[in-house]
């Protein structure tokens, strides 16, 4: 996002105006003007204040109303008590994170990729799924759908199903698939050369981080899943790398990432046709254990907050085995 730019978003059902001021600092405000509900994003931003396009009311980046042009001087009414909600924001590794909680001091730690401090993504792709947050998270962490959903000459085929065994350990607010050599049927990793190793981390509420190492080179993938509303989610997939030749391959990599995400999007869309009948669902051991952990993590987080106690990770070290 450029300086003096704004962007209208809906996150967690809330209309949000995200912007970057003249000094480069990000901010987030509730979008509807508290006067007559006109989206502030439809107005003008000069790098310091947002001006509503309807009556010219102005708000600073902290949400405080600074000017009401229609007010007559000397009247008792002033703009000082008028505000639109301001949300705490932080920018980490080129991503802007918005906190919706009531107490900014209780905001969780922002997820970051090791080895890319101060870096912005080399490639970013975004896609919207017509699916609820839980089904989207479970769908993207599911290890067994690859040969059926992600069939492609450059990735894998249905005939490439293999037995897999991966070690998992608990990690902050989630779990980690321990460092391992990528499966032989995952061809894209070969672009890095050498002997690549990958580690995959999931943490609440809905963030997946993959660290890939091949000799002295690193690739990092950060996937963040944001609920737009109860039935729609937005996926942001950010890729970082240190291998210089990957920059030359960026058009190919973008095509690959888009194709991969669209395949997931299509399968999510089809799943909704069955889910609208609220069928009973079955999670099996090993292949679906990560999904079980996700629901357990959510329940424990809610209980810990309600009881005012520290979060206790319910995930225990375990090796999972499946075919994919």
What are these regions (language model features)?
Residues 25, 104-324:
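C-terminal catalytic domain of Rieske-type non-heme iron oxygenases
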Residues 1-116, 321-324:
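Rieske [2Fe-2S] iron-sulfur-binding domain
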């Amino acid at each position: 996002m450029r300086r003096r730019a704004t962007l209208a978003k809906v996150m967690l059902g809330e209309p949000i105006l995200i912007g970057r001021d003249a000094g480069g600092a990000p901010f987030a405000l509730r979008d509807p003007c508290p006067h007559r509900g006109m989206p502030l994003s439809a107005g003008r931003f000069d790098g310091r204040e947002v001006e509503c396009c309807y009556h010219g009311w102005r708000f600073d980046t902290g949400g405080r109303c600074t000017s009401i042009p229609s007010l007559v001087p000397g009247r008792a009414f002033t703009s000082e008590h008028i505000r639109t909600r301001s949300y705490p924001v932080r920018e980490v590794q080129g991503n802007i994170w918005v906190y919706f909680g009531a107490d900014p001091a209780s905001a969780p730690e922002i997820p970051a990729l090791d080895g890319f401090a101060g870096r912005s993504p080399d490639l970013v792709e975004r896609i919207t799924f017509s699916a609820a947050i839980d089904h989207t998270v479970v769908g993207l962490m599911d290890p067994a759908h690859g040969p059926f959903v992600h069939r492609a000459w450059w990735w894998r085929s249905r005939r490439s199903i293999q037995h897999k065994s991966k070690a998992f350990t608990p990690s902050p607010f989630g779990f980690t698939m321990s460092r391992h050599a990528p499966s032989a049927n995952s061809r894209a990793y070969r672009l890095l050369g050498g002997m690549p190793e990958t580690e995959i981390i999931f943490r609440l509420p809905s963030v997946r981080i993959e660290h890939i190492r091949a000799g002295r080179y690193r690739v990092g993938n950060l996937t963040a899943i944001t609920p737009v509303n109860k039935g729609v989610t937005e996926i942001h997939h950010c890729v970082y790398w240190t291998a210089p030749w990957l920059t030359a391959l960026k058009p190919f990599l973008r095509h690959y990432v888009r194709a991969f995400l669209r395949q997931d999007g299509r399968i999510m869309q089809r799943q909704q046709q069955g889910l609208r009948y609220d069928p009973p669902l079955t999670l099996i051991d090993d292949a679906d254990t990560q999904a079980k952990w996700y629901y357990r993590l959510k329940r424990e987080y809610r209980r810990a907050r309600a009881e005012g106690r520290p979060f206790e990770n319910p995930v225990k070290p375990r090796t999972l085995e499946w075919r994919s």
